[in-house]
Amino acid sequence: MNQVNRRNFLRLAGAGAAAAAAAPVAQAMGQATAGQQQQQGKPDTNIADAAKTPRGPNAMPGLYPGRVAVVKNSASVKDNAIVEQQVYDMIARSMLELTGEKRLKKAWRKFVSPGERIGLKVNPVAGKSLSTSHEVVRAVIAQLGESGIERSQLTIWDRREFELTDVGFTAENYPGIRIVGTEQMDKDGLYYGKDGKLYGEHMIDRDWYYWADVEGEYDEYTMPYMVNGGKYSYFTKILTQDLDKIINIPILKNAGMTVTLALKNLAFGAISNTGRLHAKLWNETCAQVCAFAPVRDKVVLNIVDGIKGCFNGGPGANPQFFCDYNTIIAGTDAVAVDRIGYDIVLAKRIAEGLQKEGSPTALEFMLQAERLGLGVADRTKINLKEVILG
């Protein structure tokens, strides 16, 4: 296919490819939950390889295993708009509650230092209406700056660079900060370079991979969103080579009867060839990918954007199920953060009549992550510090 035809083909295919790439997610979640997949006959994976790399000093679950700070503030949304100063105050309070520090700078400096390359892992997948909000990201950047972290140290990243751009994570909106994704498109709308390879192929690190005995097979529409097929999912060089530490900033939303928060944002954002993993290995992927060193040893903090979110129809954007949670969740323990986030979403689903009670299978990926030593899934062992500002 020549460049002109490829340009037209890929531009026309973009929306369809995105839908095709997302389709396995909806299929895997359904109205039940990813946790209700058959547990027998699971495909093999290389999870045993994760333990071969010694745990680093910042390894998950981080400085505060089992500790989660939740800050709620009804004033964080006014006339359907997020109030940035309120969000700033909520994040600041969550940092103080999490660390026990009295000064905000000292709280932040427990996790990051001048000179380090710091990645902000956002989630732009559902489009402008249901992505990590700019108000939350700007508040995090502002507080990092006040703590001595230069903008040149920061990278905002996710799987697909063009999705970041679509929702406003651009150089114009974030001057001095690198914006990058694994899967890329050039200024002409092309996914392929002059060498005939996807730009994304140059962004994956073939020395680091998650192998699963499930074949990834994609058509021409979908391949730019997957980078490669086969049984290997490669970690992005953004993680393995470009960054020292990660601050994970997912959005509070459901996925069927479970949630897609910290672990999912990390796992499916870190690797290529993910379409093959949803149907049979959704839970395993959420937990196991986070056990590999590029994720496990670099994620120092999770800040869940729970200002606006959804309680049904997720992880895609279905406006009839949007809601104002007016909440920030913070913790170093991604498993515990997900467990508390699940409780919040579950309470809303029960209030809306979608469920009468929780489903144990909805916790499956958290329980697997706990068994891998990544954090605390047992609610009775989580130290929840909850503050209501208004």
Across the structure, where does each feature detected by a protein language model lie?
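Signal peptide processing junction and immediate N-terminal pro/mature segment
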Residues: 25-37
